[in-house]
Amino acid sequence: MALYCIGDIQGCHDAFERLLHRVDFSASRDTLYILGDLVNRGPESDKVLRTCMAAGDSMRALLGNHDLHLLAAAQGVRRSSRRDTLARVLDAPDRDQLLDWLRHQPLARSHRMAHGEELLMVHAGVLPQWSSQEVMALAGEVHSVLRSKQLPDFLQAMYGNQPDRWSPDLQGWERLRVIVNALTRLRFCTAQGVMDFDSTESAEQAAPGLMPWFDVPGRATASATIAFGHWSTLGHISRPDLVALDTGCVWGGCLSMMRFGDHLADRELIQVDCPQAQAPG
């Protein structure tokens, strides 16, 4: 059995298939965690979703901002932009099955290794105040609403940059919006955990007072290894507490997968080149 994590696929099904073939992935033997943004900007989002659905529990996805955007567009609460490539899902004969599968995916996952090490997985980031247990619990609050009859109302209320910081006293849509923004959109924040959504540059280009979320001193998840995607200008990072796997497949970069051994320190990076589906900007 092999354990893998893969970065943002974003509808690039051909690259996804080539990477699965490269590692000889077996649904009966291996486990693949998909770090969000399965869809959008690439040409074949529908095929990506079908491949993941067909694999059952061997492919375990979590939701990114583009996946939530697809759900919002499908509910009619958000219009597709000129850069979106969601029509193949929205017009698919199995649209309802694809969307139902997607809405049942969580915003965070945790994998406990045989020796007790924890691999925590999110699409974008976590706030410095949150422990691993809190990340999973807060993600679960959103997961419950996504599967409920409140889905259209939640998707309507999900958009916005405020509140820009966490408080355990937050309630209702504001509470869920902060959770969603941290887990699916976060790149930079202050040392106090105030989120910034204007900067999308690499970590070295942070504005004064801002830092990558994973470099905040005293981060409560520091004892876990966190795998994430979302940040293509960051590129691949591998350090004891961190695995960054968005390497810009949709922009003509590569699709990246990490294979873990018996310990989280045992890692092998596997990549395939991607044709450019869209230009950045």
Swiss-Prot record:
Its EC number is 3.6.1.41. The keyword Hydrolase applies. It holds the Pfam family Metallophos. Coiled coil: none annotated. InterPro entries: ApaH, Calcineurin-like_PHP_ApaH, Metallo-depent_PP-like. Gene3D superfamilies: 3.60.21.10. Keywords: Hydrolase. It catalyses: P(1),P(4)-bis(5'-adenosyl) tetraphosphate + H2O = 2 ADP + 2 H(+). One of its GO terms (molecular function) is bis(5'-nucleosyl)-tetraphosphatase (symmetrical) activity. The keyword Hydrolase applies. It is an enzyme of class 3 (hydrolase). Belongs to the Ap4A hydrolase family. NCBIfam families: apaH, PRK00166.1. Hydrolyzes diadenosine 5',5'''-P1,P4-tetraphosphate to yield ADP. This is Bis(5'-nucleosyl)-tetraphosphatase, symmetrical. It comes from Delftia acidovorans (strain DSM 14801 / SPH-1). The gene is apaH.
